Amino acid sequence: FRRVLFRSVDFRLGEIENLPVADSIADVIISNCVINLSPEKARVFQESFRVLKPGGRLAISDVVATAELPVKLKNDMALYTGCMAGASSITDIEAMLKDAGFDKIEIKPKDESKEFVRNWAPASKIEDYVVSATIEAIKPKA
C-alpha cells in the first residue's frame, strides 16, 4: 500500500448523523451506498448541508426505493445490511434534501442496475422495489 498525501483532502472517522467537522468547511461530500443504512436520513442531509460551503456539492450513489417495500423485505436484516431494505423513496429523499436547504436536486435512477440488484438476493424479488441511483444537490450560495 502506497501512501499518497494530498493537502486538500481530509479523511475523518465519524457518524454520518453527526459529522466531526466545522460548519461550511467542505467543497464536496461524496457518499457511496451508506445513507440507506442510516435510520436518521433527514439528519444526514441536515449535517451535509451544515458542513458544505455555500455552493458546495453533495454527490451520492445509493439505493432508492421505486415502490413500497413489503414488511417482510424491510425487516430482512441481510437485505438491510446489503443496502437494500433501508432504501427511501425518491420522493422522500427529494423532500429531505429540500427540507435541509439544498437546491438543484437531481435524482437519477439507474434502471440498468436492476439485474445487479437481482443478483444480490435472487429469491427475494427485491429488484421490483429498489434500484441504484445517483443523487446530486447543491448548497445555495448566500
Give names to the regions the model predicted.
Residues 17-28:
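A short acidic, Gly/Pro-enriched loop at the edge of an enzyme's catalytic core
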Residues 42-57:
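A short glycine-rich, Lys/Arg-flanked "PGG" loop and its adjoining helix->strand segment in the class I
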Residues 27-40:
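A short SAM/SAH-binding and catalytic strip from SAM-dependent methyltransferases
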Residues 6-18:
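Conserved SAM-binding strand-loop segment of SAM-dependent methyltransferases
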Residues 65-84:
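Short, glycine-/aromatic-enriched active-site segment of Class I SAM-dependent methyltransferases
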Residues 96-142:
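C-terminal lobe and adjacent flexible extensions of AdoMet/dcAdoMet transferase-like proteins
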Residues 1-5, 137:
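Short, small-residue-biased leader/transition segments that mark boundaries at the very start
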